[in-house]
Amino acid sequence: MTLVSALNYIHRTGLFGNHENKNEENLLKVSEVKNLLIVQIVQYKNSTIQFENIDIDDLNLKNEPLSVVSNSDTRILWNGPKNWLLVSTKKDLLKNISEAFRETDFAVTDLSHSRAIIELEGQNVKEVLKKGCPFNFNILEKNNSVNSTY
């Protein structure tokens, strides 16, 4: 399967904005992380299956706000009650996910072609995120996940 980025015809490389005569270390770098599997997993309200024991790439789902579980290839982010977003470099993991989560208990949706992972680098990344999201980034810790429309 060939993955095509949601930003395939939009993302351009180069220097944009007020960058002239600026120290390169002070510039914000924006890039897309490509070739990822992005899957939403939602447990139906009437499901009684215990999801904590379901193993995906040696990771288990956690139903705790802001939680993230990860290894070197896969990251599972809590997206809401019984709702997770899985991001992985293992594109063939979708078959395992579909087998692990029965259709009668879970909705599994491949979002790889409609979502993009954007990476921000630079000294003022937190300030940029604060402008577009109401979350208090001062309390954000490692392995926390935040939903935003930004």
Spell out what each predicted region is.
Residues 1-150:
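Basic, glycine/lysine-rich polyanion-binding surfaces/domains
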